[in-house]
């Protein structure tokens, strides 16, 4: 989108950051009892308990947001996201095991009325020859079948926060920029094991088409070694994988087949308390890998990374997180560019390493089931290695800090339209 606000080097940038951070702290000072996972609170709530059989409902799901990314340096560009995502849809359940949803999904950014008319995977490149006016609109359809411990989904998937991908593999901001995931999904949940497998079909091609077929296959598994009991301890082993494939038998481009993947295995320890101030603490450690099975999109075929993180839930309203990341020859498919060793700002350039310290403070206050207000401030302190450009020149290693701040309001009221006999 050509109307995105790009952050530049202005003398007042530090003052802006301090003002936003002070405003954020003042806001959370009046926090009241709430759930603390902001990403999950802002995602559509897939609660089926309140759905009566043979009853037609209207869900008016909306997320209003304003997010400012003050980025500097040669890793990625800064930008601002002001807008709303609106997904009104009908919901009907003919039987306890079946559920159908039908509607539309619209993404609207303030300050523009033209949108590139193709699949949104992130901040997209403007193509003025094919665009939609008013909003980026897609049809919405979901069919859900529940069979014992398994749930099968066709159409619009339970994506985003539902996958529970770790931060280096998936950035929450995708909720504000990418198209809803569509395809097929299987979820299984037992007492000791939880699995989510999906295929997100992102780009369909016709005969003689001028772009590539693209889809992502993902799987997350979580083994519960220790579940919360009397003393509130839990210990999990999460295994996660995402694979993106581009190409297709109908592909008439000269780009060739490209298959890229990320994977991780880790350990997560969590302790909860029934207290007013300290509610929960969490530690996590994950080993990650990146693999280019086909294609030459990356200048390397394998890479690795290590992620360690800690979090505190406070006052039933705040979450404070810190993390440390170090990587070599690693590219994340859907995570933040500050975990990459490729530059998204300098074409074809790569870093010899990427060490990143991460921090975030989140505040969320739900108003019943249907509404939630949230705010988040976070930063990346990067110790990037030497930057190697395509022309053979290099930039010295540098220590930089990138800052981001956002406010959000989710509304998902449900209206009963008709009961059928």
Residue map of PLM features:
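Residues on the lipid-exposed face of transmembrane beta-strands in outer-membrane beta-barrel proteins
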Residues: 86-92, 139-145, 184-188, 219-223, ...
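Outer membrane beta-barrel transmembrane domains
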Residues: 164-168, 297-300, 304, 315-383
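Surface-exposed strand-loop-strand hairpins of Gram-negative outer-membrane beta-barrel proteins
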Residues: 63-85, 115
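Residues that define the transmembrane beta-barrel architecture of outer-membrane proteins
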Residues: 78-86, 133-139, 178-182, 211-217, ...
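Outer-membrane beta-barrel "beta-signal"
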Residues: 399-421
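Short loop/turn motifs that connect adjacent beta-strands in outer-membrane beta-barrel proteins
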Residues: 33-56, 92-100, 146-149, 192, ...
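Surface-exposed coil loops of outer-membrane beta-barrel proteins
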Residues: 151-222
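Transmembrane beta-barrel strands of outer-membrane/channel proteins
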Residues: 58-66, 102-106, 154-158, 197-201, ...
């Amino acid at each position: 989108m050509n109307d995105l606000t790009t952050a530049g080097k202005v003398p007042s940038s530090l003052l802006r950051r301090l003002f936003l951070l002070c405003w954020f702290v003042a806001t959370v000072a009046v926090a009241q009892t709430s759930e603390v996972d902001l990403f999950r609170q802002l995602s559509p709530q897939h609660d089926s308990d309140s759905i009566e059989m043979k009853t037609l409902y209207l869900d008016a799901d909306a997320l209003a947001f304003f997010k400012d990314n003050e980025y500097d340096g040669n890793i990625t560009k800064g930008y601002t996201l002001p807008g709303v995502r609106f997904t009104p849809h009908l919901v009907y359940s003919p039987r306890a095991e079946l559920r159908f949803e039908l509607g539309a999904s619209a993404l609207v950014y303030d300050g523009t009325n033209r949108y590139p008319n193709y699949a949104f995977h992130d901040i997209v490149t403007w193509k003025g020859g094919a665009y939609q006016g008013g909003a980026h609109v897609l049809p919405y359809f979901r069919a859900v079948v529940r069979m014992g411990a398994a749930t099968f989904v066709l159409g619009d998937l339970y994506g985003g926060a539902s996958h529970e991908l770790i931060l280096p593999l998936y950035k929450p901001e995708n909720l504000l920029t990418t198209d809803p995931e569509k395809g097929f999904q299987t979820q299984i949940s037992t007492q000791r094991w939880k699995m989510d497998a999906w295929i997100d079909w992102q780009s369909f091609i016709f005969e003689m088409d001028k772009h590539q077929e693209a889809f992502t296959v993902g799987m997350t598994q979580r083994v519960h070694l220790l579940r919360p009991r009397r003393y509130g301890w839990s210990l999990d082993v999460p295994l996660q994988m995402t694979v993106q494939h581009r190409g297709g038998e109908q592909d008439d481009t000269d780009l060739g087949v490209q298959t890229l993947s990320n994977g991780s295995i880790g350990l997560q320890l969590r302790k909860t308390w029934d207290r007013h101030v300290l509610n929960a603490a969490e530690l996590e450690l994950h080993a990650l890998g990146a693999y280019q099975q086909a294609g030459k999109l990356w200048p390397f075929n394998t890479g690795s990374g290590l992620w360690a993180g800690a979090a505190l839930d406070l006052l039933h309203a705040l979450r404070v997180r810190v993390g440390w990341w170090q990587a070599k020859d690693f590219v994340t498919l859907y995570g933040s560019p500050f975990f990459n060793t490729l530059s998204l700002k300098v074409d074809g350039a790569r870093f010899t390493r990427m060490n990143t310290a991460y921090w975030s403070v989140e505040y969320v206050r739900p108003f019943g089931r249907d509404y939630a207000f949230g705010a988040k401030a976070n930063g990346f302190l990067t110790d990037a290695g030497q930057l190697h450009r395509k022309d053979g020149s290099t930039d010295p290693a540098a220590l930089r800090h990138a800052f981001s701040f956002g406010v959000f309001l989710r509304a998902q009221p449900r209206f009963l339209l008709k009961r059928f006999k």
